[in-house]
């Protein structure tokens, strides 16, 4: 059996979203299934460490996918050549893209359909490409994976895809996320917020992550005793976030952080404040739960499904509701303690080991059908 995998998101300092998902599944599969040959396909020289194993072949083929036209060339010309050359049994694409020209059976993961519901969130050409081709990718796929019951329902409804074709497999979180000692928390706070407690947002600064409303809500709090820390990189150059100069020194933009440092920043936070208006899963929720910290989450899409009783909720479009949620977490010690306990308990429902096992069952069954 030969399983070919789209690994184009395994790029340095970019292991978030698709990259994290790809890495966590692929590294487990290649270690646990030495009876299977894996062809890992990159669009440029990989720098992410993938174990060197006899059953793994790394293939680099251009063009680097930096524009929808290049996406089309890579998936419709480069990928079919590689699948044919290595006699692939199945093609797995963890980012929802597919090759329409290939005759090889495929499994794709569609994480969410934000581009269908909020087209203004994306550059026009990219949004057009996704709306035109993702329905075709889903139709072409032999099986579809997705990461929440909400996303499964959305794909079924938007694309009239049979629910039996779609399997829901929850994501996990890196085991490096753990409750921290008070000494580590103090050291971390001294480093990033002058030892003041802080709210934390983690994620790409994409419009749907709703960081602007979060900042506006935070700056509406009168003389807050808690800072706000933003971790993540901008997705689009034209997406600007504005901060009122009054109190701007209490908001800290840290950019992208590697896992080890992020785990310390996460575990030292007073709470995770995660209020996107559209989400397919939300890995930071599970990272926060593993650390045992409270969560303020949006009450939309998949977020209540994932966060459960580890969070309090707000309308992501209502700045006053977001502000009220922040104020509750500042003022109500009993609430924070209860949410922390709930976080620890709920975190046990999510793991990359389980995600890899359940996803592999779909891959293996499809390849042998």
Go through each PLM region and give its residues:
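Carbohydrate transferase catalytic cores enriched for Leloir-type hexosyltransferases
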Residues: 1-369
């Amino acid at each position: 059996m030969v399983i070919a995998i789209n690994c184009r998101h395994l790029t340095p300092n970019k292991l978030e979203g698709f990259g994290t998902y790809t890495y966590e599944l692929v590294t487990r599969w290649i270690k646990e299934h030495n009876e299977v040959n894996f062809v890992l396909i990159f669009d440029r020289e990989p720098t992410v460490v993938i174990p060197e194993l006899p059953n793994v072949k790394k293939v680099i083929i251009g063009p680097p996918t930096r524009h929808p036209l290049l996406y089309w060339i890579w998936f419709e010309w480069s990928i079919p050549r590689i699948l044919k050359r290595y006699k692939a049994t199945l093609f797995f694409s963890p980012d929802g893209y597919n090759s329409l020209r290939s005759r090889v059976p495929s499994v794709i993961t569609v994480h969410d359909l934000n581009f269908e519901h909020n087209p203004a969130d994306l550059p026009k050409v990219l949004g057009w490409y996704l709306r035109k081709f993702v329905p075709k990718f889903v139709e072409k796929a032999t099986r579809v994976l997705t990461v929440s019951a909400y996303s499964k329902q959305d794909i079924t409804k938007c694309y009239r895809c049979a629910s039996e074709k779609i399997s829901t497999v929850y994501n996990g979180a890196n085991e490096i996320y753990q409750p921290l000692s008070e000494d580590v928390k103090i050291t971390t706070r001294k480093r990033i917020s002058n030892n003041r407690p802080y709210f934390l947002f983690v994620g790409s600064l994409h419009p749907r992550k709703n960081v602007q409303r979060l900042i506006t809500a935070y700056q509406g709090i009168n003389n807050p005793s808690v800072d706000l820390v933003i971790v993540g990189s901008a997705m689009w150059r034209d997406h600007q976030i504005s901060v009122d100069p009054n109190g701007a020194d209490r908001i800290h933009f840290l950019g992208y952080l590697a896992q080890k440092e992020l785990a310390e920043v996460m575990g030292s936070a007073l709470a995770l404040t995660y209020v996107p208006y559209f989400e397919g899963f939300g890995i930071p929720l599970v990272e926060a739960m593993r650390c045992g910290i409270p969560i303020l989450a949006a009450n939309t899409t998949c977020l209540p499904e994932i966060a459960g009783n580890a969070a309090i909720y707000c309308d992501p479009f209502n700045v006053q509701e977001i502000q009220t949620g922040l104020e509750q977490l500042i003022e109500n010690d009993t609430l924070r303690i209860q949410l922390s306990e709930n976080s620890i308990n709920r975190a046990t429902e999510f793991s990359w080991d389980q995600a890899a096992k359940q996803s592999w069952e779909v891959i293996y069954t499809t390849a042998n059908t």
